[in-house]
Each structure stands twice: as structure tokens, then as C-alpha cells.
Amino acid sequence: GASEGFFSFQNALDDPAMLLHLDNGVFYEFVPLHERGDDDPTRLTVADVEPGVRYSLHVTSCSGLWSYEVGDVIRFTQTFPHKITVAGRTSDMIDEYGEAIYGDEVLAALKSACDATGAHVSDYHVAPRRTTNGDQPGHEWLIEFESAPDALDDFERALDEHLQDVNRHYHIRREGDALDGPHVSALPDGAFYNWLQATNDDISGQTKVPRMSAGRDVADGLLAAADRD
């Protein structure tokens, strides 16, 4: 569900995917995520979607008076009946160097690294790390750990290995030495909350930390908040 309407619900306890609600006064269209931002992107109906593909969800009232991009990225696990999982937000993507990393890949990489090192993450943000002094560009992972790994190098290596396994664009750039591996900056407890307080007049359940950014504004703000602690 969302403020725009009620879209899906879980109908089986052993399946985390949600059944798309097709009889609720909402017309759905799905834009392949790689076409988002194009002048004339493909807009598919439920008849034409494919399982496993990332789509940006668009909804239109049955009267056609309004149409809206919800901001969620979804993937179908099956069709007829149509079941979906939420793969992240449309803003959760970094493609500064041709690596095209999505939010669900970042979340899965974090889980893999936590499983490998015994760490637990309470908050995170990923941003580009610009090239300096001839170094290769890469990504900075700003992480507030609930339980930190014994060695950040092992955590970084696990992140890198997972991303190379699941993302061929990332793998090609890493293999070609065009992209450096992940760099983790461990932030002190409360750094993310302090940043939220500094950048929002009011904090509520709807106040969220952006998980990924194509720029450095959030990352630099978080580092500044950490330095003030």
C-alpha cells in the first residue's frame, strides 16, 4: 500500500512476494528501469511484464484524470497471478562509472557481508568516491554498525565479491581496473540520526535516510555529523 492507493498484499505465509491487487480502481503501468528518464519510455501493462525485470511502477486512476510514478522499483516473481517484490526506490541507483548498481543489490551485498563476518548493520548510505591522486574511483559505504566486523577489510571484500557475482557491469569494471573496490567508513552510533536532525525540521516515521546517492551531499553531511560527535 501507499498514499496513492492499495496495490498488493501477501497471500501466502511461506512466500514473501505480494499479490498485485488488480480490482481496486487503479490502472498499472510498468516502465523498465533502464528506460526511466527516456523521452518516450516503454509503458507496459500487466499483460506484458516479465518476471525478474526491474520496473518503475506508475499508477493511473480509472478515469484517467491523473497518472503518477510511485517511486518504487518492483520485480515480478510470477505472472497470472501477478506477484511482486519491492526491489527498492527509483532513487536507489548509482551509475557514475557505468556500474549500474541498484538498491536491492546493495542490500543483498550487505546481508552477504554480514553473514560472512558476523556483523550487524543499523544504518547505511552508499555514494560515489571520486578519484584523487590518480586512484581509481569507487564507492564509499557509510555504515553505522550495531555490531562491527572484526576486520573492515573482510567486510569490504565480501561486499565486492557479492556485487561482482550479481552485477556484470560492476564485474567488468572491477576486472578491467576501472573501478576500485568498496571503501567502508564506519560511523559512530547516532551519526545518521544526528544528520536527520540537522537536515529536517521534524522527524517522523516517514523521515528516511537516502540509501544511495549519485552525489556526495548526503555522504559529506553524514561525515560532518560524525565528526561533531
Predicted regions and their residues:
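Active-site glycine/GP-rich loop and adjacent strand/helix microenvironment
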Residues: 1-229
